[in-house]
């Protein structure tokens, strides 16, 4: 039926579409639909597709076309390629989304072929955009059947790459949720993402970019690492938070964009999500969006974490939740607990943290948050400053080298600091991160920042004192204190973060929470080690680290230790 439909579709759409080719604009919505209408007989056979086609084209064309239209650049891009591949591909995506189930729809691409001349472009532009942008269909398509169809169709791959890249990215940049989405999907892709994320780890090399324009260089990095990355960069740079939702959906397309070329085949097997999370997320989020902040940071965290996980955790701590969460949450704790944890975090958990949305979510969620928060600079800064911070943070370094202090310092420091000494320490530590984020650059680098940290934190502390009290009240909160602190670290809104420890997640971003919620155990522990992990890990963290409570209680000691 598909083939007949396709054949018919091909004929009819081809005929009709070509006929309307002039009506390319019309074809986008009307002619194509008209074609569909003509195909109605055929379409009737595939009523669903037809409905989808008609419905989607209309909606997609209307909706997507304007967006695409808006992203004129995209359509043009598609246009150049569209006639040849893009067009077929475009249509394919369109067909895919519309008739994802109906590979025939992709097969129907023939009209695409005919329209390839023009209609396809118009339709694909309008629809594929819809398809890819729609994200779900594309993902469904790539993931469901289209992947096969797309995979089967090199153009499709190109289409995916090009269209999703452009279309998805078109939306993605706006959605630019790469950060969050990947995390979301990351959990699934964690492993795959890990590999992909590993590059982020390689990202350390990109750290410079991170250090520089956290977002831009990584974009370079992303661009370098990921073909589509460049395109994705905008997403990363773009609203990291908002799009995420769509990200998951769009990610596949987005990932598809990258993936198809990279692994059109992989896409089907991996499913766009995998591809997307891995590459898309990675690329997009890898924590590069933040990752630039995060991966770099994460890389730093991981790399540094690995290299100087102890140092890094602190730095990561300053860096932001992700690194700090990963390193601090676990790596530091891992350090505290032992390299294994850190190694795990660093090796996998870290990567998992980084990769498994947890950290990536953390990185993404937090980094994104951090990036959004302004961690990018801070991430860069943190990464660097953190390093500097590490350098300058003898206390932190001490904390770091104390490992116990390190974790405790960061956690106890925050937790302990949160507890009693934590006031100054807490002020120092979270604010440090907070400062790290803003003043901390220099402050972070400088030891004085502690004073500054203390100084600003004083305000923050005062602000967050309640939270701190709350934080202090609850070990988990203390853990969260780390998290809030981390969040605070991540975001100056220490007050908000600390004050609203949950808000830390919320403040941090829903993703962290979502991530937490999403992969609370894994993501949470891995990614949110800071937030959830610390919150949840307190158990683990408690176990791993001297129990946040212990931490907290002993935290006094660690604090003293740290403080000392």
Swiss-Prot record:
Residues spanning the signal sequence: none
Pro residues compositional bias, start-end: 250-271
Region described as Disordered: 1-564
Bias kind Polar residues: ranges: 1-17, 153-168, 318-351, 467-564
Superkingdom: Eukaryota
Entry GO CC: extracellular space
Segments of skewed composition (Low complexity): 79-97, 114-134, 170-179, 272-299, 378-416
Protein name per the record: Uncharacterized protein DKFZp434B061
Native source organism of the sequence: Homo sapiens
